[in-house]
């Protein structure tokens, strides 16, 4: 199958979205699918204000359209709501192409932490973006419940796999440590709300 993934989040960013998409593309290729990615690396871009690692592609519509038409994907997935995602969404709707999207991060909370933007405005924009998709894939049941409570209707849970060649059980050397044991695994960023974890 020819599968196209459109994402505004890509290397050199280091985050779960990039890791998920890179692993997904690699595994789809191993299963015999032909995967094509549209990423900011293919476009002139500028750094996002307050987060320069995020590259915002400039005027991507024509190039995204030609890439989609040339590749003629049998499945098209729009992973992000940025300039590339918006261009791909518009192209799909204009040409009657079905597509899926994914919701990877607590974007409304992220915006509220960095800018004085009400959550209702962010959720309305996200409902508009993802509502046109055949399915909007989310990472967990709790995210699915949260989005459903905010009026999202076309949700599916996209479970993440574990690479057992990389992550495997170790000897139970920590069993004798005093309880409770808590650990945070992830990036240090304002949207991760690590303060709440540290106050446990």
Where are the regions a protein language model picked out?
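Conserved donor-binding loops in enzymes that form glycosidic bonds
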Residues: 8-10, 160, 184-189
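Nucleotide-sugar donor phosphate/pyrophosphate-binding loop at the beta->alpha transition
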Residues: 98-100, 107-128, 138, 164
